[in-house]
């Protein structure tokens, strides 16, 4: 790959990023497709997120990926959010277009697409998800956006339980036709009942 005065750049921000395989993957892709871009990784702490994002815009960055701990802050800074990013309250991908930040969250999209490719479309299905962290929340939101009729969320009674309840409220307020129920993961009988309740149209 030959970098010149016209080479555009994309990047990853967050902390830590030294272990990330994204630069190798994207730079290989740019090279194979003969695109004049480079992908970098910048270690950015939460308190430096706004400053870093402003710098990326000023430098003409085409877009960037976001990892922890910056995802929520970047969602707050974005000019526009996709439906998923707005419901999740976090971004992992930002497209910079005409000086504006367009925030997306692709975690749930990837998971739900993989289900569909393997014959499990979530539309009109009953979904049971164990967990309420970032990835689980993204899956719950994307399942709702793609037409799931009911979502059961099970999570331990820890700091993420309130997040599960908040996600349920947001989904029901923003996505018509879907019901979301939250239960403690410690309630094994309830978990058994909800999984047993599911029919051939269900996904766990």
Question: What residue spans do the PLM features occupy?
Answer:
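Conserved small/polar residues in nucleotide/adenosyl-binding loops
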Residues: 201-204
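Phosphate/diphosphate ligand-binding glycine-rich loop within oxidoreductases
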Residues: 2-118
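Glycine-rich phosphate/diphosphate-binding loop of Rossmann-like nucleotide-binding domains
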Residues: 123-199
């Amino acid at each position: 790959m030959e970098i010149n005065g016209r080479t555009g750049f994309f990047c990853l921000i967050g902390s830590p990023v030294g272990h990330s395989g994204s630069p190798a993957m994207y730079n290989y892709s740019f090279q194979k497709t003969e695109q004049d871009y480079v992908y970098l990784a910048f270690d950015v702490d939460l308190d430096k997120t706004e400053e870093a994002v402003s710098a990326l815009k000023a430098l003409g960055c085409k877009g960037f990926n976001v990892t922890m701990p910056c995802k929520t802050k970047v969602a707050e800074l974005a000019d526009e959010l996709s439906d998923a990013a707005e419901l999740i309250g976090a971004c992992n991908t930002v497209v910079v277009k005409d000086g504006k930040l367009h925030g997306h969250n692709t975690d749930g999209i990837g998971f739900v697409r993989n289900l569909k490719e393997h014959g499990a479309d979530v539309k009109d299905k009953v979904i049971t998800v164990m967990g309420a962290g970032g990835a689980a929340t993204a899956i719950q939101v994307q399942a709702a956006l793609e037409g799931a009729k009911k979502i059961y969320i099970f999570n331990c009674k820890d700091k993420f339980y309130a997040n599960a309840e908040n996600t349920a409220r947001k989904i029901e307020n923003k996505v018509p036709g879907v019901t979301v129920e939250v239960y403690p993961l410690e309630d094994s009988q309830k978990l058994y009942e909800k999984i047993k309740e599911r029919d051939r149209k269900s996904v766990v």
